[in-house]
Curated annotation (Swiss-Prot):
Family recorded in the similarity comment: Belongs to the pseudouridine-5'-phosphate glycosidase family.
A Pfam family assignment: Indigoidine_A
One GO CC term, this protein: cytoplasm
Biological process, per Gene Ontology: nucleobase catabolic process
Binding site residues for substrate: K89, V109, S143, A144, D145
Cross-referenced InterPro entries: Indigdn_synthA-like, PsuG
Protein name, as recorded: Pseudouridine-5'-phosphate glycosidase
Cofactor or coenzyme needed: Mn(2+)
Residues spanning the signal sequence: none
Chain's gene name: psuG
Amino acid sequence: MNNLEEFLDISEEVKEALHEKKAVVALESTIISHGMPYPENVESALNSEKNIRENNAVPATIAIIKGRIKVGLNKEELEYMGSNKNIAKSSRRDLPVMLALKKDGATTVTTTMIGASLAGIKVFATGGIGGVHRYAQETFDISADLQELSKTNVAVVCAGAKSILDIGLTIEYLETFGIPVLGYKTENFPAFYTRESGYKVDYKIDTTKDIANILDTKWKLGLNGGVLVCNPIPEEYEMDKDYINKIIDETVKEARDKNISGKDVTPYILAKLHSVTENKSLKANKELVYNNCRVAANIAYDYSNLSR
């Protein structure tokens, strides 16, 4: 750990929890800086942390601030990430640049996994993962999240992937790289706003204790890489599949026509969705994240008990 102190600031609360082998759940900061408007983004981040605390775990929101990987943000730092409009999304390729040049960066799934792993955190809650984009056979637009899942030992609890992606190809990619896809109490791979995508997970697992045991077994075997835990959006917040997919299809086409590509695609589509659905999609987004936080906290709690 000593050689990482040059780059890593772990909050006292998180440091103490890790030292005492308590449950800790990592959270990303892209959802704060790029996923929701201010001040709802900060309020949502605080609620995410609250949901984790209420389920026997310590939250550790991760961000890059002035060239430091911060693991566990205080209220002022959350406010800074939420209100500052000049914070870039930072993936694996950006990390050394951001740190060397003392920049600010919002952590994606990829960089949150890296930060969590450096700190010794094994469970991370997010909204949805990136994946293989539609038309990837032409653009080669494949999220770095998938590669990170293949090599970094952190479990990612999510509501599947947004249907802005090619979900079938995303699942094929996960299989190719040996990433287990578990469904928490479901056989279906969820599609973020909806509970089903038309595709299946690898295994339906009904308890967080079983998921914790799977993580423990995988890493004890020396099988490096994460595990994807798919936790569908609660039924009461699920959006109509045909309605949301129609809007997404139109917006994906619009983005292509405007030559919007790479890491600008998802924020563009999300902003459009929030506008067209009169913020119903924003409400759904928040609730699925809170739901993932609760499940992740329970997994982290059960996992921490294995090492006591």
